[in-house]
């Protein structure tokens, strides 16, 4: 690899070391100059603001207006181009933003049991989507709202100086780079191993004016931004319209409830993510297999099976095992299974925390025959509820200073993340010959009882998804 690549890898390792030393509720990672305004950009902003006319605004088209479907292949091609154009500093910025997203995601996920109670089905959360949604709102925020959002995103500020401020455009561009780095790796022979699509829906009351620079800025995060207007006075009807619109445009399973909204709400800011991972060398078993939800209850579920040399570690002290299944050279699926089903909550607390990636250093290669459920999961959550449950400042209360988003009075009804997550077999290229299956050194790993999973990309140090599967056939 070229020296620049070695320098990038070394610097990322340094950033990881700094991250490991972080303590307390806030995460302080150096160097922050990668994501804050520098003196030059601050001077340019000051000059621009001095004689700047009012930002142009527009009223979004009605939600019933005809809209072209999202072309996911074109979206993936755009992400690949983004990744191809990244220089060393861009990759460092992506790695830093990836780690910041991890820390926020762990904290949010860590409070999920208090919000959802015991999860009897399956649930999935995206740290990068959480971070991207809050960074998008930061783009439209001013004054105290911006201060609080910046603190939640993990970037400290000492004063009101511009050079202490988070640069939302840099952060959103870095988030798109994080997505691009994941997708670009699996594009050999025009066959995508991984698919990751993000769509932002900005749903407003019919009279609300959006500022064009805000909507244009969101395109740095994802090219697909859908501003639409609708009546919120009948919340059930509004939620149904949003769901119908998003399913028509994307074809994904979505969920919009507007349970936290009121009839005078004027904004629902929703982020939709679709992930599809193909498990190289795995095949779908001919018959469904038993999955034990608990000691006395089982369900029949479609199962995937494959064999290869995978990284593996069994923790005898805390009674869980980890298997790392590669998607690409640097992206992988982490499967975490308690040795005893009753220990799922304990293992979740041990592994899904800020220093949890340290145990990845203990993994070693093993020849493994792996059997696991085929996963098709949908999860939706309102960030207002999650942040409140995580005891973070109530930054997403109904009335915020979002004057960079709109000059009109805004009452936030919902800040939704909706995840559509799929794992499927990719039988084009077997990982290793199945003739080895009966050899004594082959380790049998069967996920037929509750387990945890994560999708991790080393190239951006980003955990794209964290999930818990207590029953593959139902969502929490």
Swiss-Prot record:
Gene3D superfamilies (alphabetical): Alpha-1-antitrypsin, domain 1 (2.30.39.10), Antithrombin, subunit I, domain 2 (3.30.497.10)
Gene name as annotated: AGT
Keyword Disulfide bond: yes
Family to which the UniProt record says this protein belongs: Belongs to the serpin family.
Protein name: Angiotensinogen
Pfam families the record matches: Serpin (PF00079)
SUPFAM superfamilies cross-referenced by the UniProt entry: Serpins
A GO BP annotation: vasoconstriction
Keyword list, A-Z: Disulfide bond, Glycoprotein, Secreted, Signal, Vasoactive, Vasoconstrictor
Location within or outside the cell: Secreted
Main localisation: secreted
GO molecular function per UniProt: serine-type endopeptidase inhibitor activity
Keyword Signal: yes
Entry comment on modification after translation: In response to low blood pressure, the enzyme renin/REN cleaves angiotensinogen to produce angiotensin-1. Angiotensin-1 is a substrate of ACE (angiotensin converting enzyme) that removes a dipeptide to yield the physiologically active peptide angiotensin-2. Angiotensin-1 and angiotensin-2 can be further processed to generate angiotensin-3, angiotensin-4. Angiotensin 1-9 is cleaved from angiotensin-1 by ACE2 and can be further processed by ACE to produce angiotensin 1-7, angiotensin 1-5 and angiotensin 1-4.
Cellular compartments per GO CC: extracellular space
Signal peptide (UniProt feature, chain positions): 1-24
Top-level lineage group: Eukaryota
Entry function: Essential component of the renin-angiotensin system (RAS), a potent regulator of blood pressure, body fluid and electrolyte homeostasis.
Residues carrying covalently attached carbohydrate according to the record: 38, 161, 295, 319
Annotated S-S bridges: 42-162
């Amino acid at each position: 690899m070229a020296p620049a690549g070695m320098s990038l890898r070394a610097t990322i390792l340094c950033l990881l070391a700094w991250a490991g030393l972080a303590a307390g509720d806030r995460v302080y990672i150096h160097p922050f100059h990668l994501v804050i305004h520098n003196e030059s950009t601050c001077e340019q902003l000051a000059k621009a603001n001095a004689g700047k006319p009012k930002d142009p605004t527009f009223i979004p088209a009605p939600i019933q207006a005809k809209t072209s479907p999202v072309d996911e292949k074109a979206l993936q091609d755009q992400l690949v181009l983004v990744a191809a154009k990244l220089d060393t500093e861009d990759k460092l910025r992506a790695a830093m933003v990836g780690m910041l997203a991890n820390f926020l995601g762990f904290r949010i996920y860590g409070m999920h049991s208090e919000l959802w109670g015991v999860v009897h089905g399956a649930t999935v959360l995206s740290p990068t989507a959480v971070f991207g949604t809050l960074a998008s709102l930061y783009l439209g925020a001013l004054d105290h709202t911006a201060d609080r959002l910046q603190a939640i995103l993990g970037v400290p500020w000492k004063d009101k100086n511009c050079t202490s401020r988070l640069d939302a455009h840099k952060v959103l561009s870095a988030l798109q780079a994080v997505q691009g780095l994941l997708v670009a790796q699996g594009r050999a022979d025009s066959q995508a191993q991984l698919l990751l699509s993000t769509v932002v829906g900005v749903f407003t009351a019919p009279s609300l004016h959006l500022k064009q620079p805000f909507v244009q800025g969101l395109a740095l995060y994802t090219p697909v931004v859908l501003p639409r207007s609708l009546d919120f006075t009948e919340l059930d009807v509004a939620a149904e319209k949003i769901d119908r619109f998003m399913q028509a445009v994307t074809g994904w399973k979505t969920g919009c409830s507007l349970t936290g909204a009121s009839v005078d709400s004027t904004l629902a800011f929703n982020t939709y993510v679709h992930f599809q991972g193909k498990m190289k060398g795995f095949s779908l078993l001919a018959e469904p297999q038993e999955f034990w939800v608990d000691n006395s209850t089982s369900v029949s579920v479609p199962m995937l099976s494959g064999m290869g040399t995978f990284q593996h570690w069994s923790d005898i002290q805390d009674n869980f095992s980890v298997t790392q299944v590669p998607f690409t050279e640097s992206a992988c699926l982490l499967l975490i299974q308690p040795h005893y089903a009753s220990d799922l909550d304990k293992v979740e607390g041990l592994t899904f925390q800020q220093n949890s990636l340290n145990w990845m250093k203990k993994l070693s290669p093993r020849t493994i025959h792996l059997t696991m459920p085929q996963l098709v999961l949908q999860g939706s959550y309102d960030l207002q509820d999650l942040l409140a449950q995580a005891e973070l400042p109530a930054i997403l209360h109904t009335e915020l200073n979002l004057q960079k988003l709109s000059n009109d009075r805004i009452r936030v009804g919902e800040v939704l993340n909706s995840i559509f997550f799929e794992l499927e077999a990719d039988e084009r290229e077997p990982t290793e010959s199945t003739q080895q299956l009966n050899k004594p050194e082959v380790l049998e790993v069967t996920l037929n009882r509750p387990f945890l999973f994560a999708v991790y990309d080393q190239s951006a140090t980003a955990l794209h998804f964290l999930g818990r599967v207590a029953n593959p056939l139902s969502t929490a």
